[in-house]
């Protein structure tokens, strides 16, 4: 059977369900597909289809993730749901499933629980820009005041993590009833998706951002000069444009005199393209893997940052023993390893942590031996002797 062509007639947005275990994330995901399937906008999936999520590997870490897709009248969505709490933590930190927004599922019977808070904090740290609340299991709560209290509590919780708690939509749903075909609750799923359409903004396309390409390899071509190759992460580049070479050594400016892809000359390269850029007046020894080529003035190199980190368990190929402040691993950033030191660890409540165990999620302060192009929201791996022992995301640039 011929594969269906992906029709790009609607804007595409990536979302996911987050929240405490057993509050109904997977049931809600199934309910959304079933309600939209009745309008021909999704393929109906049941709980078991989504719950038996396949394992994936991202940056050397195994994560179970279910992907479903569906449409509303105005958009095409890719929706990610994870079976286990640890999968969420790993997913959000590695950026395996980049989310432009998330539906946070809270059971009206329980209110916000430990993982609700942890997922909201993580959403803040890893840069999930917008949230919508699905207050689930509302069919099981007879008292309207009780539901109102839970809603107030969640709004306060969101505000305490610097989300706009007063403005975020909170929709009362019963995922199970909607899945069973109860028309009143099916209507609530429509209402939820309308909120997602309206309050999760369309992401800025990578192509519209300032140009950035991480250098993977460098060649010199006799008579023509030096070529840097890599995948364009964002923006676009034309022949004749000036770029800066940033990281490891002092920043310098050069002009792109040629853009090649698959040995053919291009007028311009854009986000997602694997290209070779011919650079004017640059020697092969001036540029190396791990540097980035960027639009002039768009990025500065840094050495000190805070990161939200997941430390791999022994079974995941991580360390067998704990480590302490002062630990000196390699930080794998974009295309290269940079030696650095972890100077401090902090718990969620801001207190200092002495020791970090395999399997922990922790906030750390890292300092690199040479400046590289790091940015808030950027992913990195922590490695030791070539194997990955942790994954992180930059939550703040210090210096």
Swiss-Prot record:
Region annotation (G2) ranges: 60-64
EC number(s) stated in the UniProt entry for this protein: 3.6.5.3
Binding positions for Mg(2+) per the UniProt entry: 26
Annotated GO CC locations: cytosol
Chain intervals for the UniProt region annotation (G5): 174-176
Keywords attached to this entry: Cytoplasm, Elongation factor, GTP-binding, Hydrolase, Magnesium, Metal-binding, Nucleotide-binding, Protein biosynthesis
NCBIfam families: EF-Tu, PRK00049.1, PRK12735.1, PRK12736.1, small_GTP
Region: G3, residue numbers: 81-84
Annotated spans, G4: 136-139
Subunit composition and interactions: Monomer.
Chief subcellular location: cytoplasm
GO molecular function terms listed in the Swiss-Prot or TrEMBL record: GTP binding; GTPase activity; translation elongation factor activity
Domain tr-type G as annotated: residue spans: 10-204
Role of this protein: GTP hydrolase that promotes the GTP-dependent binding of aminoacyl-tRNA to the A-site of ribosomes during protein biosynthesis.
Subcellular compartments: Cytoplasm
Region (G1) residue spans: 19-26
Similarity remark: Belongs to the TRAFAC class translation factor GTPase superfamily. Classic translation factor GTPase family. EF-Tu/EF-1A subfamily.
Source taxonomy: Bacteria, Bacillati, Cyanobacteriota, Cyanophyceae, Synechococcales
Class of enzymatic activity (EC top level): hydrolase
InterPro entries named in the record: EF-Tu_GTP-bd, EF-Tu_GTPase, EFTu-like_2, EFTU_2, G_TR_CS, P-loop_NTPase, Small_GTP-bd, T_Tr_GTP-bd_dom
Catalytic activity: GTP + H2O = GDP + phosphate + H(+)
Chain residues that bind GTP: 19-26, 81-85, 136-139
Name of this protein: Elongation factor Tu
Source taxon at top rank: Bacteria
